[in-house]
Amino acid sequence: MHCFNLKTEEKFDPKKHVERVLGRVGEGDVTVACWEPGQVSPYHCHPHATEIYFCFEGGGVMKTPTETVEIVPGSFVVHPPGELHEWNTGPKRTLLFRVRYGGEMSGRTKEWPSNPDWKPRPEDAEYFAAR
């Protein structure tokens, strides 16, 4: 059994969101993701992993190619393998609990407009060019 207290695991950074892996289980992991107001994730996907987010506190907007959904405490979102998504934090600090599973969990980033220092990796450009 793995048992965690999300409030004692949280860690925030004003420059970028913080993800902390709390544990690994089988072909997956459980993490806590801490977001300051206004922070935005890259527009990305996990080609071989399902990703589930549960909003513990705070909130924001989750975008996919087909919809935009407001996320509030108690909400959870399931992204199947390969689904592009972007998280945009609302006006409050946000604490998300995340579960990823399905073998290879690395992500592919398509774009990150809110990060002027971001440059696409060759493997990401190749992945999206093939789609």
Identify the meaning behind each predicted range.
Residues 1-31, 42, 109-131:
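A short, N-terminal "cap"/entry segment at the start of jelly-roll beta-barrel domains
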